[in-house]
Structure formats: C-alpha cells, structure tokens
C-alpha cells in the first residue's frame, strides 16, 4: 500500500522517492520532482553530451599570493589570469578587476591551463550560479585558476553555441543539481562532461538581445565616465595635461629638504602627483583637510565564522562588508551570494557605532592596477536590509560640516584620478593606505547648497545609467525565457 502524506502537511512541500530510484545521493533537492522531470525532458531531447564537443578539458591553479613577485605582475607586461568573476552569463569575458601573471608562470606552472581565442571557459566551483560559460575573444591569450575549466572545441561558433546553451537557466539548474559540497559546491569532471546538449537551437533571439543590451550598457558607460569630468569642472579643477611617457619624461628630482624625515616613495613626489595636488588649489572654493570634518573614526573587525558556537548575548550576526563588496562603479554590491555573515562581539559593534551616511574606506587590499583607498557610503537602505559590520581591512569615518554624499562623490573622484595612489605603501603584495596622509588630503568645499546641487546631478546621472543597464538586463532575460520555453514545449 503506497504511503500517504498526512493531511496536516502541505503536499506541495513533500515528495516521495522510491528506494529503487535513489542514485547514490541522499540530498532531497536532487530528487525534487520539478528538477528531476526537467532533466529527464532535456535528456530526451538531446543526442549528445558536453564531452562530445570537447577536444580537451583542463583546469588551472592559483599561484601563492605570498610569492607575488615570483608569479604575478601588472597589466602592461602580464598575462590575464582569469577568475570566476571574469565569467559572464552573456557569454563574454569581462577583464574588469583582472589579475595578471608573468610569462614564466604562464608557460611554466600553469602551462596546462593556457587559454586561447575561441576557448570555452566554464565555472565548476564556488557558491552561486554554476556552469557560467564565456568564450575567449579573438586574439586572447590568458590563463585560469582551479575554479573553472578550459574547454577547447576548435570552432568559434561551436564555443559560442555551447556558451549560450550552458548560460540558460534551465541548463544551469541541471548543472547545479549534479554539483556536490556544502559551503563550496563543485561540479566534478564526469558530471560536467555528461551535461546533455540539445543541438540546433535557434539562439538568434538571444544574439539580438545581447546586441541591444550592449548598446544600452555603452550609453550607461558614457554617462558614468563623465561624472569625474563634471565634478572636476564644476569645482574649477583643471587636470594637468598628459605628457608622453618616455623615460626622460618620467625622471624628476626633489630637493633633499622636502624628503628629509618623510617617506622615500617616488610616487609621493612624482611630477604627475604634484601637479594633481596643485590643481586642487586652483579651485575658487574653500579647501580644508579631510580630518577637519571627521568626528568619529573606527577600524573594523573580522569577528568569528557564523558556524562557530558563540554566546548570542555577547555576539551579533552581521553582514561583514569587505573590500570585495566595494563596487568600482556604484557603491556597495551586497545583493550577491558571496557576502559573508559573521559573529561580531557586541562591545566591538558598539565601538563601530554605525549610522547612515558613515563613509567606509578600503585601507588594505588593492591590486597591481587598482590603488587601495576605494570609498563607499552606508545608506538608510543598506542599514535597513541587514545588520552591518565591516572587516579589519576597512576603516569607518563619520563626518559633519559637509554633505556626506558630496564627500563620498568627491573622494571617489580623487581615487579615480589616482591622487590616492600616492597615499599608500605596499608589503607582501598587499597595498596599505597611509591613514594619516589620507585624512590630511585636501577637500574642495563649495557652499552647502552647491554641494547638494552636485549630489543631485551625480545621483541623477547614476540613476539614468543604472536604468539603462537594468533595461538591457531585462531584454536579455526575456529572450532567454522565450528560448527556454521553446525548448520546454518540445
């Protein structure tokens, strides 16, 4: 007699699997009827598996960050070292926030995971979406870590077809179904290779949507790229004219009395930095050091892992903001699956004394091509959604006597034009902000009504750009849904 679910239990939350149907895995999610029937349907339509299109599959590794000088370098002389964040569901690689390795590492330690044009790159490890796929563009030379694989297909159009296919939500659900592991899910090679592939799907709808999305993103970028120019112009700050970068142009001299007792860092005294600093004083508005506006200042804390047992009367679980959450374009990126929740001691939370309009400064981190010192602001919306703390790599300031949002936009521009680059030191591959110099930097201070005018204008530009990006994202999502529905209806 078949088992019947008791009436007091919602039947839509319960499903029954016969013992004979168990496939060696005991996670309930694997046997959920909706995903099981979806996979059965996809397999019934497919005649091939991913392995049938792969000439070779290889994974990489991550060279030790403790030996930065041995393995890594800058973008000018280095080879792109791809990570999961460089993969996109539109099938294209993003080289923003890219790390670079030297040629010896590329041709030695990581020779087996070299990436060439038209190779298919697929995510196999990590939280969030599984099997994100991107195609290496024409002329590309790169490498990758262990969290994705390089699949050589030998054919450009085939790689693009497979990327479109793997980036469909219904196929991602199948890939995620076969991943294992709790805190860091992984898709092993046998499971990856056995992903069913349906041939001859018409992806023209997605191609058209991608083109429209790209056009909207380009318009958004134009708007965002003009923000720094607008802010500098309205403050009367004229950027120094760029000169050629010959060796002779980069050589400069400094009087000994200027460096006596100070730090021997050529960046601090370089002609470009000196000219940038001088340009601030050309503004007709008042100037004050940042420290004049700071009324509270506090370092962060990393706390304890959320899996640890703690006395909940003495600790609070918080979303701990790290440098990873700093968005180079907007503010903080907290709506992803990579955020960290940790236990923070209540006494330390009290010292942090977090309020809306507090500014967070990245004091340690950065990369070869990205100075440390990025800035973010805690808005009412952020504080309403989560109990917030911040890591020991972040420093918080509370200001008065100046519009906090204006100060946020101003400091963001100062970072973008590389003034912050002169306020840091570097040890073991990690950049550290020299806080005393950062707090002593010059702030151009127009009257409060002018500050608000600047804030309103920049906020409106960012809003327009965000709307364009969201429109592009929606167009692509709808196209994918149409293609997926055509597959399901077969």
Question: Where does each model-flagged region fall?
Answer:
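Ordered, small/hydrophobic-rich secondary-structure cores
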Residues: 124, 149-184, 189-226, 405, ...
């Amino acid at each position: 007699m078949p088992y019947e679910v008791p009436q007091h239990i919602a039947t839509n939350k319960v499903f029954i699997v016969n013992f004979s149907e168990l496939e060696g895995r005991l996670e309930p999610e694997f046997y959920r009827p909706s995903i099981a029937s979806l996979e059965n349907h996809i397999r019934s339509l497919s005649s091939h598996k991913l392995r049938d299109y792969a000439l070779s599959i290889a994974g990489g590794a991550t060279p030790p960050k403790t030996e930065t000088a041995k393995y890594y370098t800058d973008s000018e002389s280095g080879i792109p070292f791809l990570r999961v964040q460089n993969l996109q569901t539109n099938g294209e690689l993003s080289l923003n926030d890219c790390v670079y390795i030297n040629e010896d590492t590329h041709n030695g330690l990581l020779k087996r995971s070299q990436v060439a044009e038209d190779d298919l790159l697929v995510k196999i490890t990590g939280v969030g979406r599984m099997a994100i796929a991107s195609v290496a563009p024409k002329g590309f030379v790169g490498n990758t870590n262990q969290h994705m694989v390089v699949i050589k297909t030998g054919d450009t159009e085939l790689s693009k077809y497979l990327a479109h296919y793997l980036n469909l939500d219904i196929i991602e659900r199948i890939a995620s179904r076969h991943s294992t592991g709790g805190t860091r899910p992984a898709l092993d090679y046998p499971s990856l290779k056995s992903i069913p592939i349906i041939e001859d799907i018409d992806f023209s709808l997605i191609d058209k949507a991608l083109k429209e999305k790209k056009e909207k993103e380009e318009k958004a970028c134009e708007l965002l790229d003009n923000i720094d120019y607008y802010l500098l112009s309205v403050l009367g700050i004229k950027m120094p004219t760029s000169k050629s970068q010959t060796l002779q142009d980069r050589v400069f001299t400094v009087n000994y009395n200027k460096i006596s007792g100070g730090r021997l860092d050529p960046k601090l005294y370089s002609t470009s930095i000196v000219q940038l600093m001088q340009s601030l004083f050309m503004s007709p508005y008042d100037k004050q050091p940042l420290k004049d506006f700071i009324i509270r200042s506090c370092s962060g804390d990393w706390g304890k892992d959320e899996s640890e047992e703690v006395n909940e009367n003495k600790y609070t679980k918080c979303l701990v903001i790290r440098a990873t959450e700093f968005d180079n374009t907007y503010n903080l990126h907290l709506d992803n699956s990579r955020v960290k929740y940790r236990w923070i001691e209540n006494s330390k939370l009290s010292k942090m004394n977090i309020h809306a309009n507090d500014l967070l400064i990245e004091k340690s981190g950065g990369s070869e091509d990205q100075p440390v010192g990025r800035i973010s602001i805690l808005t009412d919306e952020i504080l309403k959604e989560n109990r917030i703390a911040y890591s020991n790599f972040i420093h918080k300031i509370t200001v008065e006597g100046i519009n906090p949002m204006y100060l946020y936009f101003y400091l963001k521009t100062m970072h973008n034009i590389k003034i912050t680059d002169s306020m840091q030191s570097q040890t073991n591959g990690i950049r550290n902000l020299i806080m005393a110099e950062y707090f002593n930097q010059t702030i151009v201070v127009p009257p409060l009504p002018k500050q608000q005018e600047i804030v309103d204008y920049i906020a409106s530009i960012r809003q327009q750009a965000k709307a364009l990006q969201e429109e592009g994202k929606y167009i692509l999502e709808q196209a994918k849904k149409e293609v997926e529905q055509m597959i399901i209806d077969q």
